Amino acid sequence: MAGDMMTYETDVVVVGSGPGGSTVARQLARAGQRVMLLEMGRDYRRDILYGSHLGAIVWSDDHGFLFTEEGLTIIRPFMTGGATNMYCGCAALPPVWLKERYGVDLDDWALETVRELQIERLPDDLLGAASRRIMEAGQALGSEWQPLLKFMAPSRAPRFDCGAKCMMGCRCGAKWTANEYMDEAVAAGCTLLTRAGVDEVIIEDGQVGGVRGKLRGRQPFEVRARVVVLSAGGIGTPLILQKSGIAEAGRGLAMDPTVMVYGVSKEAGTAYEPPMTVGCMDDEHGYMLSTLIDPWILYPIMATLKGPSYLLSWRKYRRTIGVMIKVTDEVSGMVSIERRVSKPMTERDRERLHHATVVSRQILVKAGCDPDSIFVSRLRGTHPSATVRLGEMVGNDLQTSVRNLYVCDASVFPEALGLPTVLTIISFAKRLSDYLLRGVLRQEEVRATAATSAASV
């Protein structure tokens, strides 16, 4: 019956199967730990809708219509592998400032992952002709454009077929997703429970005791565990913490606010080229530029949100080139326990966006786009993060104020990354896994053995 509590017991429970959660589950399971991985969504990889426009709507929070109170669109997929199903497969090494300002050195884990997953730039012939024109135009104007590192390998796919549609799920198989680490975790003995929504963490005398939630939205369940790792994302993790009595979670967030600057060329545009193959980072002015365009069906929706007249640009979609602006924003706003998200743009954020927009327009014109065709899309939030910040709400070891309760996802970023986030999250997760295996889990085993011995006396 739906009202009967289902109970489980394990050593470590990991909540969320995105890049953070799947990595922790994989590392710990491979080391022989009893691990249970809980995922709110389902595994859609073999679903007929995977990689389609309709599928992306079906498995996204609020079916793709999740907005901040200020109107920023947020895409938050509920599925195994999390947001890596819908990312562009871009990789960036962890920023140097993590080490310089916060004492967190992720270099070894990042380089290990680069080697393991063969993260590298795409061959020149796969960068895309329009993307190369944008890169050359940017270089001619003084920007340091270059090919970007990718979680994407043509050799993995029977037929390399990447374009704007990659953001809906990779059907050709070239793009790495966290599902692969999840599969490896399960193969190593991890128990995977899908459609398992976690509501709260069990806290007993300042010590974690497990988690509670509902299966399929109605069946109560409880998992008892000695260690809990929350990896439910920049929005999901603070919501769970708030419901568990940790009120400061979600006070302030970063979002890497993003817009596309579109222009129409006489030649083919970027729609049928791999996304974000080239780009540049302007550290001085605080933004990243790359080549990106919304998928065919999403484009008119985003254009209409900008204004009804912009819908007419859809008929020139094949010749449209998109330059993405990702702003390194200041922490502001909040995620509330009622699932409301507020993310106002600060004055500095707006200045950075304005500078990037001017530069992007110049690049598009230099690349041959009609100046009169250029427009800027509606603002959207791409990387909800910094909601459980390292140094404020979690320690250097990612532990919260509750003993053996850890957070490992974009929530722990102490400030906006302003870069592709996945490699940094994986690096944090490998670092945390090593820390748990070296100390915490050994200590818990000793403590459990001692308690059992005392009880038998």
Protein language model annotation of sequence segments:
Residues 105-199, 377-387:
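Conserved redox-cofactor binding core of oxidoreductases
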Residues 2-100, 213, 248-264, 431:
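N-terminal glycine-rich phosphate/pyrophosphate-binding loop and immediately adjacent elements
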Residues 69, 83, 246-358, 362, ...:
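FAD cofactor-binding and catalytic pocket of flavoenzymes
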Residues 158-169, 199-204, 352-416, 422-426:
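A glycine-rich dinucleotide-binding beta-alpha-beta segment and adjacent secondary-structure elements
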Residues 18-19, 235, 412:
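Residue-level detector of alpha-helix initiation sites
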Residues 37-38, 192-193, 406-408:
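Short hydrophobic beta-strand that contains or immediately precedes a catalytic carboxylate
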Residues 30, 41-45, 200-201, 211-279, ...:
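Glycine-rich loop(s) and the adjacent beta-strand/alpha-helix scaffold that form part
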Residues 33-35, 145, 228:
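Hydrophobic anchor at the start of a short beta-strand
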